[in-house]
Design a protein with these regions (language model features):
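PP2C/PPM-type serine/threonine phosphatase catalytic domain
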Residues: 1-383, 387-394, 408-412, 419-441
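Hydrophobic/aromatic side-chain positions at a characteristic register within alpha-helices
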Residues: 361, 398-402
Length: 441
């Protein structure tokens, strides 16, 4: 992303159905200006605590608070180094708390941080929380699960799904239990306008398929999409806390109207003029100086001398503006802003995409969501739960053969019904329908 424009993002964390306390945490720290964006970038982070109610919550909150702060503190050393140091120092701090307080012994947390900068997307990662990139009809998993299942799958060369559910929730790497931790640093992944990045705890990915995630994100606003994703996880049992962050890179289809307005010929001319005014000023001054020379050769000194002085002044203003633009360039450049002292950038980095999923909207996926809607309608009516049925009827109108629009309407209808279910769930915790849980994580 070449020019500074704040990304659109939304966050949501939910305790789930079965848990009494929320041990997840998340934070968003978008850059406030172009200089901060170029030096630090936009920061987003999720964490999934473990070790008991208060213990896990303390660990995850500390992670989402300390990692962004420490990253910003060390970013002058390079992005990769800063991320690694931020995770390592946070791990040491959590571990020390566990060692000094017997009631906190064994406290830990996963953590996945996303840094969006001019050169691309960086990810720091420990545990089995995940980062995805949704681009068009493809969902890409950008992190490796530090779980027993994924490690065995890596060593044996098989798909993690082939190992079933045995020890699926056993993680082999987290912040806190040990004095040192190995941190995965991914990136910088190229970023395109309209890309959506998703960070989440395993409370989402254990119950909602990546294909479903991508399809939902592609048809709903970020705010509606994050609510529907959390609702789906809860409707399918909600055994764990659920946390989701969605970040949309500016310039995609959702920004088409504003992009069109800013891309008019007059707007482009104004932007070009504002960016390159020092050069134009110097050229104008040079033209005036040349004209004064012609007047001088024609012995029109009363005209040539004032014109030459004016030309000199114009050129001087242009040179001052050019120097000022050069000094400001590092804060607004579209290229990488990676210090040469960063030892991890001396060699080309491998951009890992651990899994890819097709999230195209198909008739089968539409039918699946129609079934979810019908199951939800039946359950809500059986329990006499109040719903705005008039609004639901409007959403049930046919989409005239447009598959994408039909899927969007089904998502909006499910969201309306799930909101009502969510309110009733808090009043009557024993009310739980039986939902189909996908096998793939």
């Amino acid at each position: 992303v070449s020019a500074f424009e704040p990304p659109r993002y939304t966050t949501l964390t939910d305790v789930g159905v079965k848990r009494s306390h929320n041990q997840d945490a998340c934070a968003a720290k978008p850059a406030v200006d172009a200089a901060t964006y170029a030096s630090c970038g936009h920061i987003f982070i999720v964490a999934d605590g473990m070790g008991g109610h208060a213990v896990g919550e303390k660990a995850s909150v500390k992670a989402v608070r300390d990692i962004p702060h420490l990253y910003q503190k060390h970013v002058h050393e390079g992005v990769a180094v800063a991320l690694r140091r931020a995770f390592a120092e946070t791990n040491a701090g959590i571990h020390e708390i566990g060692q000094q307080n017997p009631e906190f012994r064994g406290m830990g947390t996963t953590s996945t941080a996303l840094i969006l900068r001019p050169e691309g997307a960086w990810i720091g990662h420990v545990g089995d929380s995940r980062a995805y990139r949704i681009r068009g009809n493809t969902v890409e998993q950008l992190t490796f699960d530090h779980s027993w299942v994924w490690e065995i799958a890596r060593r044996t060369g098989v798909d993690p799904d082939e190992l079933g559910d045995f020890k699926r929730n056993v993680i082999i790497r987290s912040l806190g239990p040990d004095p040192e931790v190995e941190v995965d640093i991914e990136g910088p992944h190229p970023v395109q306008p309209g890309d959506v990045f998703l960070l989440c705890s395993d409370g989402l990915t254990g119950l909602v398929k990546p294909e479903e995630i991508g399809a939902i994100v592609n048809v709903l606003s970020l705010e509606s999409a994050v609510r529907l994703l959390v609702h789906l996880a809860n409707l399918r049992g909600g055994p764990d806390n659920i946390t989701v962050i969605l970040v949309r890179v500016p310039g995609g289809p959702q920004d088409a109207d504003s992009h069109h307005r800013s891309s008019s010929p007059l707007a482009r001319f104004r932007r070009t003029l504002s960016r390159h005014w020092p050069v134009w000023t110097i050229l104008m001054g040079s033209a005036a100086a040349l004209l004064s020379l012609l007047f001088h050769l024609q012995e029109l000194k009363t005209v040539s001398l004032p014109l030459f002085l004016l030309a000199s002044l114009i050129i001087l203003v242009g040179i001052i503006g050019l120097v000022h633009s050069i000094l400001r360039a590092p804060a607004e450049t579209s290229g990488p802003d990676i210090p040469l002292t960063d030892p991890e950038m001396e060699q080309p980095r491998t951009l890992n995409i651990y899994r890819q999923h097709d999230c195209s909207i198909t008739p089968e996926r539409l039918n699946q969501f129609c079934e979810i809607e019908q199951q939800l309608i039946t359950t809500l009516k059986e329990h006499n739960i109040s719903v705005d049925w008039d609004t639901h009827a409007q959403l049930a109108a046919p989409a005239d053969g447009d598959l994408r629009d039909a899927f969007r309407l089904r998502c909006e209808a499910i969201l309306l019904l799930a909101d009502a279910f969510h309110k009733a769930r808090h009043k009557q915790e024993s009310f739980q329908p039986s939902w189909t849980t996908p096998n793939q994580r």
